[in-house]
A protein has these predicted regions:
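Generic signal for short, ordered secondary-structure residues
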Residues: 9, 71-77, 88, 103
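Juxtamembrane loop-transmembrane helix junctions in multi-pass integral membrane proteins
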Residues: 3-6, 77, 81
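An amphipathic alpha-helical interaction surface
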Residues: 80-166
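Sequence-level detector for tyrosine residue identity
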Residues: 4, 22-23, 36, 66, ...
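Membrane-proximal alpha-helical anchors
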Residues: 2-69
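Context-gated lysine
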Residues: 32-34, 40, 67, 72, ...
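Generic detection of intrinsically disordered/low-complexity segments and helix-coil linkers/edges
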Residues: 15-17, 57, 76, 103, ...
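Membrane-interacting alpha-helical segments
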Residues: 55, 60-78, 127-135
Length: 166
């Protein structure tokens, strides 16, 4: 025969298990919602005329070497160009941080950006690396992380979409 105390222990344990399951499920749903919001933010930003113009401007910059880049687009020499460039690059560094922390899904990001973001990285990688050597060793590390993750997705899928981008 089952006594009252045993039933009480069983129901307490069952209640705690149900509460834990509910809490974990709620956390998972909140994380999915946050990932969706972050992708939505990127899509909304990317589809603006201003962002398209920034992308074209960033991709059309030309320079011979790091010193020439500084002369044309450096913070002291050309603050407007510097701000425009680095605000654009920082956006991808921030996205890389979100991917690293699980706040944005790399598969989703890869599907919506594919070659455009890695092409920016390829163009500016020498500038970023020189910037790191000159005193900013962590400059754009999350942008680099994002690119590495995108390459992993490309290899995993076997699409070789990014093969020519290094």
């Amino acid at each position: 025969m089952v006594d009252y105390q045993t039933l009480s222990i069983v129901f307490t344990g069952l209640s705690i298990s149900i509460a834990a399951f509910y809490y974990i499920n709620t956390l998972r749903n909140a994380q999915k919602a946050k990932r969706y919001e972050n992708i939505k933010w990127f899509l909304e930003r990317r589809s603006t005329t201003e962002d398209m113009l920034n992308f074209a401007w960033v991709q059309n910059q030309e320079w011979e070497d790091y010193k020439d880049h500084l002369r044309k687009y450096g913070m002291k020499e050309n603050p407007e160009a510097w701000a425009r460039l680095w605000s654009y690059l920082i956006m991808f560094d921030d996205i890389g941080l979100m991917v690293r922390r699980g706040l944005m899904d790399i598969e989703d990001f890869y599907d919506i950006s594919q070659r455009s973001i890695p092409s920016v990285w390829k163009k500016y990688q020498p500038i970023i690396e020189e910037h790191r050597k000159r005193g900013e060793p962590t400059s754009m590390i999350d942008f680099e992380y994002l690119i590495n993750e995108m390459h992993s997705v490309s290899k995993r899928r076997g699409d070789n979409l990014l093969a020519d981008l290094g």
